[in-house]
UniProtKB/Swiss-Prot annotation:
It is found in: Vacuole membrane. It comes from Emericella nidulans (strain FGSC A4 / ATCC 38163 / CBS 112.46 / NRRL 194 / M139). Residues 107-906 are vacuolar. This is Probable dipeptidyl-aminopeptidase B. It holds the Pfam family Peptidase_S9. The active site is at S743, D820, H853.
């Protein structure tokens, strides 16, 4: 804890005890953060007292000097005159003393009154990354408007009709080059062919403007998507059109239902058909005919075919498709989802009508209610089954998997077509700690359990529902006598890349190993040369570099510069001979197209260098970032500290902790980023600290899995321990420490405040928090907590329930979107009820109508961050100390009368 000599000019109070309301705000040890707040205070005082800078006890003369009961009967005229002269002398002395004290106050290292425009001494003693010590102040509006976001290009690679590698799709408004065109990297990016000449196309008197395009594999047709309407996070409905490249004309996907809203459409690998979903039913349109064939007929509100329901879209596939064509186009695999047993949760919309339907006359003033099939922890899950459709026979069929989990205990997390009608299917139990891999043969209609792993016995952890398995076909001439597949497995406590061959072999060839992890591996495979490309954290958990390794596990080679900190992502061409390499930080991001055909990569073209961003950054004063480690209970955790541009180690700075902290997540990394935390550090002048505690990703399974069954506990310990470490630093004001987060970070904010009980953190800001994990969806929650039926004590412990502990904080803020379909408002309302029952009042709450989890409706996103910033300023200014336990302010004259007449009451 900080010693008293740090602040000898003011009274030291416990961080969890509000100041007496009788004390003046001028001698509060938490007053005065910024010039703006001082000016606002002065405006208020001018309006109420008509005098600035005087102690409140000295201001009553201008307002109440002649008020009845002001003691004039006790004094003669002469004594009154002497008293006035004496009083003015006291006033002048007080004013002078106050001014001197104020000057000393702001020159002795207090960070309260600093704003971005103040000239502070620059610290040149350290070497920190990406800071600029001079320049214009960063504004919140600039951060929110995205002016500091790097420009980036998402390349859509496409395989040529004859197997050509290095082709990519470009779309633009250049009529001369063509609106949608194929460029050939092998020919220096020259246009290989034009698919759409113009950015619009006419169909039966309608002008169609594409919002997205999907060329067929043979590049003779283009699927045009228009009139998109968002459904959930990844899903949408739209109008679909088939565009013919040769004639430059288009027709509806379903000529007999032009206005039907389509949820998904996928090309056959042979380019001769399109599978699509409408109203939760799966259809097939062969291009040889205008006829649309229904594959399923009973889809609707309870049954989904080919598209996921809410929970599978959100928590398993992170996308809008559960439909897969076989490589030869002869079969379609798809998931049937039965939601009939899943309870509904109502989401209300008071200002908007997401359904697009107008209410009946007289019902305009009632909210629209959207009933969502949402399985909460412990509630019935949707039943999922894998089905197949034989295109030639027109038959839907299933293949029994006798060793699979029961319907109410099964999650299908990945489906991969292999060769000759074989399919790899990965499933887990409901609690996601037992993995089963099946090999399904659609020709013999038999299945085989080829791999099973009990992760709970291995390390007490869980299986993440990733979709990264890659089929490797046999090629004896290339040293691959059997089919196989690549998968990420747990190996010696870390996630590593494994090669299983033949398909039914449960013992893999390990391609990587060590105290580091592969990330969504493999990224690409060069089947000709037998090379696997992947991104990994081999250099540091906060970095991402590109590597390659041979299929026998030899010759692991970095392909990016590992001598410098770096964070890279990559997008490969179909044959893995070319790639879009994206450098994302810590310096200004850039993108280049590289060739991987030699022993070393070759840069073919820089497609983005973000020169404008580099010039913009040079004009602004941005925070420095200090990356370091902290060891807690034997675990090494990653920390980044953002310091104000003019950091002065002789000053005392407030500290804001920012976190997300969800299982497997990462917030501390080396990407370039100018965000809300940057604004807080650069323009509000606070230090911002982020620590990825236990439970987060890329630091090994032991640190990640320790949280299972009791999420929030160890994560809070790590936040508190790190905060205590920072509180001891000579440049930190330990009496002004706050923490904030959104979603899981909102939960962690409240859990940390609850566990800390005001000892370290005084303030917190929680946006869209989970407050009881029984309220969140089953697939996510049970992966980390088991079911409530199996772990009732764990759920009790993780809920925000200790109101006395929250009361010990100075104040906290809770924000929630009223129409959040992800983290329901039920969470915050339940917390408020607990606070009410415990008579806890030291909090603020703000709801945003019709906003979902991202809080965007009607300017809400800007308002959220403005609210967070202003609330934080008030916190570190000491406003929440001064507003605690408010009492009516009696007149100065009445207080003077009480001093003169101790018995005065009225």
């Amino acid at each position: 804890m900080r010693s008293s000599e740090d602040r000898e000019d003011s009274e030291l109070l416990p961080a969890n005890r509000p100041r007496s309301p009788s004390r003046s705000s001028y001698d509060s040890d938490d007053s005065g953060l910024s010039v703006d707040s001082i000016l606002e205070e002065q405006k208020y005082n001018a309006a109420t007292n008509e005098t600035l800078g005087l102690p409140q006890e000295m201001r009553y003369h201008d307002e109440e000097g002649g008020e009845a009961g002001s003691n004039e009967a006790l004094h003669t005229k002469a004594s009154s005159s002497r008293s006035r002269r004496l009083l003015w002398l006291v006033v002048l002395l007080c004013c002078g003393g106050w001014v001197v004290a104020f000057v000393l106050f702001i020159t002795q290292g207090r960070a309260d009154y600093r704003t971005a425009t103040d000239e502070l001494q620059s610290d040149n003693s350290g070497s920190f990354s990406d800071g600029t010590s001079s320049g214009k102040p960063l504004t919140l509006q600039q951060v929110l408007s995205g002016v500091f976001l790097p420009r980036g290009h998402a390349i859509s690679w496409v395989a040529g009709p004859d197997g050509e590698d290095g082709l990519l799709i470009e779309r633009g408004e250049d009529d001369e080059a063509g609106y949608l065109r194929i460029n050939d990297i092998r020919q220096d990016g020259k246009v290989n062919r034009v698919l759409m000449q113009k950015p619009t196309v006419g169909v039966d008197g309608r002008t169609i403007k594409p919002s997205a395009t999907r060329p067929s594999p043979d590049l003779k047709k283009v699927l045009i998507i228009s009139n998109q309407e968002k459904n959930w996070r990844h899903s949408f409905t739209a109008s679909y059109w088939i565009f013919d490249v040769e004639t430059q004309t288009a027709e509806p996907l379903d000529p007999n239902n032009i206005d039907g809203r389509v949820q998904l459409a996928l090309w056959s690998p042979k380019s001769d058909a399109i599978a699509f979903v409408r109203d939760n039913n799966l259809y097939l349109r062969k291009l040889s005919s205008e006829r649309v064939v229904p594959i399923t007929k009973d889809g609707g509100e309870q049954l989904f075919y080919g598209v996921p329901d809410w929970v599978y879209e959100e928590e398993v596939f992170s996308g809008n498709s559960v439909t897969w064509w076989s490589e030869d186009g002869s079969q379609i695999a798809f998931i049937r989802t039965n939601e009939s047993a899943v309870p509904e949760f109502p989401v209300q919309y008071f200002l908007s009508r997401p359904s697009g339907k107008k209410p009946q006359p007289g019902l305009e003033n009632y909210p629209e209610v959207r009933e969502i099939k949402y399985p909460k922890a412990g509630a019935p899950n949707p039943f999922v089954n894998l089905q197949f459709y034989d295109v030639e026979q027109g038959e839907v069929f299933s293949v029994d998997t006798p060793d699979d989990f029961d319907d109410d205990d099964r999650l299908i997390i990945e489906v991969i077509w292999a060769a000759k009608g074989k399919v790899l299917v990965r499933t887990t139990n409901r609690e996601s700690d037992i993995l089963k891999v099946f090999l399904v043969d659609t020709e013999s209609r038999e299945s085989k359990l080829i791999r099973i792993q009990d992760i709970s016995e291995l390390d007490g952890g869980w299986v993440e529902p990733t979709q990264s398995v890659r089929f490797i076909p046999a090629d004896p001439d290339k040293g691959r006598p059997f089919d196989g597949y690549l998968d990420t497995v747990v190996h010696e406590g870390y996630d590593h890349l494994a090669y299983f061959t033949p398909l039914d072999n449960p013992e893999p060839i390990m391609l990587t190993s060590g105290e580091w992890e592969v990330v969504d591996a493999p990224t690409a495979v060069d089947l000709t040369r037998g090379l696997v490309y992947f991104i990994a954290t081999k250099e540091a958990p906060t970095e991402r570099h590109l590597y390659r390794v041979r299929l026998d596990g030899s010759d692991l080679t970095p392909l990016t510069d590992t001598s410098q900190p770096g964070y890279y992502s990559v997008s490969f061409s179909d044959g893995a001979g070319y790639a879009l390499l994206s450098y994302q930080g810590p310096s200004i991001p850039w993108q280049s197209i590289i060739s991987t055909e030699g022993e070393k990569t070759t840069t073919l073209r820089i497609i983005e260098d973000n020169t404008d961003l580099s010039k913009l950054v040079a004009q602004y004063a941005l925070p420095t970032e200090n990356y370091q480690n902290i060891t807690i209970d034997g675990f090494t955790l990653q920390v980044v500290e953002r310091r104000p541009p003019h950091f002065n180690p002789a000053r005392k700075y407030p500290v804001l902790f920012h976190l997300y902290g969800g299982p497997g997540s990462q917030t501390v990394d080396r990407r370039f980023n100018v965000d809300f935390q940057s604004y807080v550090a650069a323009s509000l002048g606070y230090i911002v600290v982020t620590v990825d505690g236990r439970g987060t990703g890329f630091i090994g399974r032991a640190a990640r899995c320790i949280i299972r069954g009791n999420i929030g506990h160890y994560e809070a310990i790590d936040q508190i321990a790190t905060a205590k470490n920072w509180a001891q630093k000579p440049y930190v004001d330990e009496s002004r420490m706050a923490i904030w987060g959104w979603s899981y970070g909102g939960f962690m904010t409240l859990k940390t405040l609850e566990q800390d009980a005001g000892e370290t953190f005084q303030y917190g800001m929680a946006v869209a928090p989970v407050t009881d994990w029984r309220f969140y969806d089953s697939v996510y929650t049970e992966r980390y907590m088991h079911t409530p039926q199996h772990n009732p004590t764990g759920y009790d412990n993780t809920s925000i329930s200790d109101m006395a502990a929250l009361h010990n904080n100075v104040r906290f803020l809770v924000i929630h979107g009223a129409s959040d379909d992800n983290v329901h408002i039920q969470n915050t309302l339940t917390l408020i009820d607990k606070l009410d029952l415990a008579s806890v009042q030291n909090y603020d709450v703000h709801f945003y109508p019709d906003s979902d989890h991202s809080i965007f409706f009607h300017n809400a996103h800007t308002m959220v961050y403005e609210r967070l910033a202003s609330w934080l300023v008030n916190a570190f200014n000491g406003e929440w100390h001064r507003t605690a336990n408010p009492v009516p302010d009696e007149s100065m004259l009445r207080r003077l009368a009480k001093r003169v007449w101790p018995g005065f009451a009225h």
